[in-house]
Every structure is written in C-alpha cells, then in structure tokens.
C-alpha cells in the first residue's frame, strides 16, 4: 500500500496521483495548496464570480416597443386606452419611484404520495404614493423566489387610484372621491371619505395599501374573516380599483374620442 501511495492519494486524488503525496518543495510555483488550485482564491473566490449583470430590456409586445422608444410616456395614456400590460419592465420605465413592501410570507403545504410538500406564499404591495398601487401574490419553494415573483405580479397589477376631496376643493386631493366597496371571499372593505387631517382610520393591512396609493385621509369599515390577510388585502385592492368605476358629475363632460397609441404609431410598429 505504501508503494501505491496509500488510501490518501493512491487513485490520483488531490495529493498528486499514484506516486503518493508530493513533497512541498516539488510543487510548481504559483499553484498554491488545496490540490493546486490556489486555495480559496484560485477560482476568483467569492468576489470573482461577480453579481448578476443586468441585461438590456428587449420588449416583445407592441406596447413595450412604444414605451421603450418614448412614444408613450405616462401610465395614464395606457389606462385611458385600456391597453393590457404584459411586461413588468413597462412599469419600471414609466413609474420608476415605486416602493414595495412585503405584507406576509406564509408556508403552505400540499399532501403528495411522498409526503408533505412545503412551499412559501408571499404577499407584496407596491405603490408610488401618488395614485398608483398594485398587489401581487406568488408561491414558490424558496422565500426569495416567492418575493421576486410577487413583486413582478404586483407591477403587472398596478392600477390607477382616483383621489378627491371631502368638502371644498382646497389644496391637493387627499381622500377617496366617494364611498367604495371591495370584496374578496368573506371579507368586505368599505372606504369612506374623511376630512383633511383625519389620517387613515384603518387596520394595519388596508392602511399600508392606502398609504402606498397616496390617500392621506380615509375612514374604513370591514367585515368578514379579516384575520385572513390575503383576502383582507385583496378586498382593499378591489375597493381602490373601483375608485375610477363611478362616473361622478365632474366627469360628465363629453370629450373628443382620441386614437389609441397603436393607431397613432402604426407606421412605426409596421417598420419594426
């Protein structure tokens, strides 16, 4: 066994092959220890791999191409024409000051033939505190993957929130324009306009969504199983989404019908 190098390095291991462990003085210069790979730094170490490089966005939809070429510069132009947003990069390009917050991360289990499979469900709210809010839900095997997926889903679900006044139209809009109601499963949330300076009178979950939507003063009423955070957040999101569903008297004025961005820029879309 001694002639073959023994068990330590008899089969070409890190010790130097069948000839046994190579003496320290016979090692070639510059290769270091640990099998001749220069130790921990031989492959660049932790810093040698670098972070993830951001690749340039290549849009795959017509709307994405128009946004990248600055043909569309606001989210309102997209909402007024009811254009579906299929790429989250569109939101990043038009609304760069979005803030996201993780509402909850809960483990969920599924019974399989091999046993219980555990995954993680993430609820993420996103908004710019200026009339745009979104809510995303994602389930994944890892927490980080679930959060990233929920952020993408929230960006694709960003909706405009209409703000109004409680009494006289003095200053900037600060509350919801009228009473609105949202429902999800057994949870029902009602948003009620409030005077300036009242603040958001609400439970913690709707308060975060209302704050991200840019609403400063609001009364809320909720009923149902509000302990279910997911349904509570979805009901609040549905209520905020309905702020543009009511045609109040200040919107009765008729306006000329404009062409959609696809019609205005059809020549550019045909060339590219």
Curated annotation (Swiss-Prot):
Coiled coil: none annotated. Keywords: Repeat, Ribonucleoprotein, Ribosomal protein. Residues 7-22, 30-48 have a biased composition (Gly residues). Component of the ribosome, a large ribonucleoprotein complex responsible for the synthesis of proteins in the cell. The small ribosomal subunit (SSU) binds messenger RNAs (mRNAs) and translates the encoded message by selecting cognate aminoacyl-transfer RNA (tRNA) molecules. The large subunit (LSU) contains the ribosomal catalytic site termed the peptidyl transferase center (PTC), which catalyzes the formation of peptide bonds, thereby polymerizing the amino acids delivered by tRNAs into a polypeptide chain. Interacts with ztf-7. Belongs to the universal ribosomal protein uS5 family. This is Small ribosomal subunit protein uS5. It comes from Caenorhabditis elegans. The lineage of its organism: Eukaryota, Metazoa, Ecdysozoa, Nematoda, Chromadorea. The gene is rps-2.
């Amino acid at each position: 066994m001694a002639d073959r190098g023994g068990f330590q390095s008899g089969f070409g291991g890190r010790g130097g092959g069948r000839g046994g462990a190579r003496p320290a003085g016979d090692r070639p210069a510059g290769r270091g220890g640990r099998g001749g790979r220069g130790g921990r730094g031989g492959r660049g170490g932790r810093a040698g791999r670098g972070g993830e490089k951001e690749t340039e966005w290549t849009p795959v939809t017509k709307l994405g191409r128009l946004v990248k070429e600055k043909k569309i510069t606001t989210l309102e132009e997209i909402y007024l024409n009811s254009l579906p947003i299929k790429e989250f990069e569109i939101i990043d390009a038009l609304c760069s000051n979005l803030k996201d917050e993780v509402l909850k991360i809960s483990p969920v289990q599924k019974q399989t033939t091999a046993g219980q499979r555990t995954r993680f469900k993430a609820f993420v709210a996103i908004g710019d505190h200026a009339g745009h809010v979104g809510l995303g839900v994602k389930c994944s095997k890892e927490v980080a993957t679930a959060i990233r997926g929920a952020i993408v889903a929230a960006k694709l679900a960003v909706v405009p929130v209409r703000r109004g006044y409680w009494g006289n139209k003095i200053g900037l809009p600060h509350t919801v324009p009228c009473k609105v109601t949202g429902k999800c499963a057994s949870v029902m949330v009602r948003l009620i306009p409030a005077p300036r300076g009242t603040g958001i009178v609400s439970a913690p979950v709707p308060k975060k969504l209302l704050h991200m939507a840019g609403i400063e003063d609001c009364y809320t009423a909720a009923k149902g199983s509000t302990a279910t955070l997911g349904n509570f957040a979805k009901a609040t999101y549905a209520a905020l989404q309905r702020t543009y569903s009511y045609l109040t008297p200040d919107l009765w004025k008729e306006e000329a019908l404009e062409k959609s961005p696809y019609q205005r820029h059809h020549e550019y879309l045909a060339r590219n």
